[in-house]
Amino acid sequence: MAAEGERQNLLSKHLERQVKILQSICKNDSEACNLLDLGYILEKNLFAPADSRKADSGPDPQLNFFPPFLTPECLALHYPFFLTTSIPPSCKGNRSGTDTYSQFCSRSSCLEDIPDPSEWDDSLGNVSLMAELKENQKLAPLEEDSPRTTAVDESKCSSKQSYSYPALTFPPQVQKILFDYLIGESQDPNDLDSEYKLAFTDEDLPQEGQAEKTKQRETLGAVATFGAVLLSIQRLFTHPVVIKNTQESLHYTFLHGFVRMVHLLTEVNLSEFVTFHGLTHRNRLNNPVQHRQLEGADRFDYILDTIYLYLVFAWQTAMDIWSQTIDEETERNLRERVKSLKPELAGANYAEACSLVSNTVFPPLLREALVVNIPDFVNQTQLANFRLFINNKSNVPASVCPALPSDFIPLTYEESHPVLWAHVMLLRLAAFLLNHGQYVQAPDESSISLPLCDCNLCAPHRMPCYNPMLLNEILSIGKFEVRGPDTEGKGFSLTPQVFANAYMEKFYSEDFHPHQVVLYKDDKAQFKTEPTAAVIREPKLLALIRESQTRREKSILKRGGGRYLDPQTGEVLGESSHGIGEELQDGPSYGEKPSHDLPSYGKQNPVAGRGLQAAGERVRRDAGSPSQPTEQLGRRTPQRGGTGRDKRGRGRGGRSATPDPRQETAEKESLQGTRRESS
């Protein structure tokens, strides 16, 4: 009751503050009540008030903001559990130049078998040391180390013994049930002298001899501690839809591939959009291209670590969603189901027991529900803060020590203690996703003639260099307008926003290889679907538009010499078929134009969601295209409903960003493209 009263009190204070703000606005601004954009009113009066004098009627509600750069505690409440243990000598930081590291970096498949937990050795192994190790030194300076890892091993972390790994477990309620029925009932910390009750007594186990019974108890303890959750993680993250969604989200995170192409054509930065529990947020303070400033091993390590943290964050988000749905009745039913497994578990081996427990506590129905809702769109700033949070918990001062969380994780199961196998799995999956998404190979320059990405999401269908019809369509953006016989009827023009919405839906599941690295540039025979344009699917119509455009430009040039400017746009005719095709840079010069000055889509803003179904329907209505959308792997249409305790995780994308009405006119003018040719 006390907690309920406290929540009501906090809600009352919040509502009281909002009422004070609105009352003060309506009193001082006569136009406020007539305006429809409440967000603009609050922005105008909170961040740029006309009268900044101090009020005499108590604390100013406008100044009740969260302290800058202070991490909110609600972030820690998301999943604040850590596993603090000794750093294994076989960690990634001690494997430079070894065959294990080379095989790890070139991973081309995400499907693998998990060995028996009794087969492991996390010793340093055969490595080329630069100097003799000190007593209890965990990180060894190696001859093949990069400058970053050398700094970490030799000076910054030479005496570090342990690290805090973010927890990769089931929700606490589920984990406690497994411990109670597979290991033994939890003891009261104040009553440790009482007799400990084992989950499986000697009479419950069919094995002969005390040694065999003890071994079976250890096996079931391993299943409860890490075996069942390890199998559940593997089943979730190797699901084809999750791999597709993860790669799509990582393209947003790194402004990579087709997301980079949209930015090149429309100057809209989709990496500003992030999602969490079904709501879409826009944050303009993110820098999505900082990884392009790195080279060699540093670039590989940074991208690998970012993807690893992304997977950790995705699993913890899924467990957070699941945890909130577990009520007393659900917990009671789960206890009964796990208890009913005991006769089968008593005689099962490790693999069989893991499968039984995982199928019970993490059934296919739950897995399918999570598949369509994770992972979220996450930007690099979020993951950088997550990295800092983990290092702070591990006593690693990030300002002077360039250590990454992935440096402390072994590369194979055989070289790791089983309690870290979940981290080994996610790190190995991160290496596969890195190669599968071609993030390290991204070019520094941006041009429609360059392969910005060779992954299955982009090549060949979304890359103009591999898709001639798509290239012709891009060169026709803003170059024509089609009208019907009725002059007052609605016409069609291929605008950047119409093209972008259709372009982002351009995905063919039959050409997507989720479990293997199959690149179009290396093996074209593996791709069956013929590349087409995004909006104008009829090749003859597209060719006619391009021919008409070229013929008109040649006709203009025949009238005389010199340079001819388009009277509407000022474009130099005859020098470039379309301004979009020019070589543009968005690498080191990304920060020359602040992201908040970039034009948005106005009323057709692209949503950072899976497949952009709603946007695609709008494109087809505008274009009048009879083509049907292709069947896609991905999520359901983003929901616009609330996200209360009973609704969290049900929708994707949520609300799209609302454009600023003060910039709407300028945005429309900036997206007009070049001149239009009437029929």
Swiss-Prot record:
Q: Which keywords does the record carry?
A: Chaperone, Eukaryotic host gene expression shutoff by virus, Eukaryotic host translation shutoff by virus, Host cytoplasm, Host gene expression shutoff by virus, Host-virus interaction, Inhibition of eukaryotic host translation factors by virus, Late protein, Methylation, Phosphoprotein, RNA-binding, Translational shunt, Transport
> What are the annotated GO cellular component locations?
host cell; host cell cytoplasm
Domain RRM, residue spans:
235-353
Q: How is it modified after translation?
A: Might be cleaved by the viral protease. Phosphorylated. Tyrosine phosphorylation enhances preferential binding to tripartite leader mRNAs and allows ribosome shunting.
The region called Disordered is annotated at 552-679
Q: Where is this region: Binding to host EIF4G?
A: 178-232
Q: Which residues carry this modification: Phosphotyrosine?
A: 252, 564
Q: Does the keyword Repeat apply?
A: no
Fill in the subunit field for this protein. Monomer. Interacts with hexon protein; this interaction allows chaperoning and trimerization of hexon proteins. Interacts (via N-terminus) with host initiation factor EIF4G (via C-terminus). Interacts (via RRM domain) with viral mRNAs that contain the tripartite leader; this interaction allows ribosome shunting and expression of viral late mRNAs.
Any idea what job this protein has?
Protein that inhibits host translation while promoting late viral translation by ribosome shunting. Blocks host cap-dependent translation by binding to eIF4G, displacing MKNK1 from cap initiation complexes and preventing EIF4E phosphorylation. Binds to the tripartite leader sequence of viral late mRNAs and recruits host eIF4G, PABPC1/poly-A binding protein and 40S ribosomes subunits on viral mRNAs, allowing ribosome shunting and efficient translation of late viral mRNAs even though conventional translation via ribosome scanning from the cap has been shut off in the host cell.
Q: What does the similarity note say?
A: Belongs to the adenoviridae shutoff protein family.
Q: Quote the HAMAP family the UniProt record gives.
A: ADV_SHUT
> Can you say what this protein is called?
Shutoff protein
- Protein's organism: Snake adenovirus serotype 1
**Taxonomic placement:** Viruses, Varidnaviria, Bamfordvirae, Preplasmiviricota, Tectiliviricetes
Gene name in the database record: L4
